[in-house]
């Protein structure tokens, strides 16, 4: 037995091209530190083959994610934090195998049918949402460092959505944005259907997270069912 797919591949290549090779994966998760590549070196003749298979169907996961070993500290307002030793980029966070949401505003609302950013039910005649605009200047003023945050809005005529990366703040404290070209008919932002995420100050709901890349610190507000000394954390 060997511990990694890479080692199994190395051993399989030692057999002649006329030999069938059966690589059997035991139950569990196999994390790939780099892309697993099959090349001509892994090929056999037409009458022979190399097979990668699970010993027990459905019990093996090959993951491109990275499992983190973290020491969590409880902070204020139900938010926990942990330092990450390596310099990482986090696009997605999984806790106990469940994908979590970046810190965002407005928050997602549980339930079926909320087809606009998991917050609203699409209404073509909507004029106001009854809550503060995600891009209200008073809200932006509260963000200490929104760089690497995201702005998502619907096209003003609801012909799709558009997205921006926040590059920082301008001298007048407005946002410096890059993007918005995702629709073939440019338009202004929709006045209601707007959402921001990956903003530290918007971390206020269970299941939300924020990663401070400068401090290498991950912030997370756990669900009521999660015990932070026992959770499994994976990133992509």
Language-model-detected regions and their locations in the chain:
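Extracellular polysaccharide-degrading/modifying enzymes targeting complex plant/algal/animal polysaccharides
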Residues: 1-236
């Amino acid at each position: 037995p060997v511990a990694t797919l890479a080692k199994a591949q190395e051993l399989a290549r030692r057999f002649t091209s006329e030999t069938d090779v059966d690589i059997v994966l035991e139950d569990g998760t196999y994390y790939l530190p780099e892309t697993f590549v099959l090349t001509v070196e892994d090929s056999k003749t037409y009458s022979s083959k190399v097979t990668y298979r699970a010993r027990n169907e459905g019990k093996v996961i090959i993951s491109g994610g990275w499992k983190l070993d973290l020491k969590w500290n409880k902070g204020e307002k139900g938010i926990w934090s942990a330092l990450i030793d390596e310099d990482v980029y986090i696009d997605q966070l999984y806790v106990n195998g469940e994908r979590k949401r970046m810190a965002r505003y407005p928050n997602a609302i549980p339930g079926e049918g909320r087809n606009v950013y998991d917050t609203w039910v699409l209404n073509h005649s909507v004029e106001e949402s009854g809550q503060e605009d995600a891009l209200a200047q008073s809200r932006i003023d509260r963000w200490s460092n929104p760089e690497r945050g995201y702005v998502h809005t619907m096209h003003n005529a609801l012909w799709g959505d558009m997205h921006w990366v926040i590059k920082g703040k301008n001298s007048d404290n407005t946002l410096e944005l890059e993007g918005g070209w995702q629709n073939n008919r440019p338009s202004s932002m929709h006045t209601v259907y707007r959402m921001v995420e990956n903003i530290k100050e918007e971390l206020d709901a269970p299941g939300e997270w924020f990663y401070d890349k400068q401090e290498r610190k991950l912030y997370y507000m756990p669900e009521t069912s999660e015990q932070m000394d026992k959770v499994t954390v994976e990133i992509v």
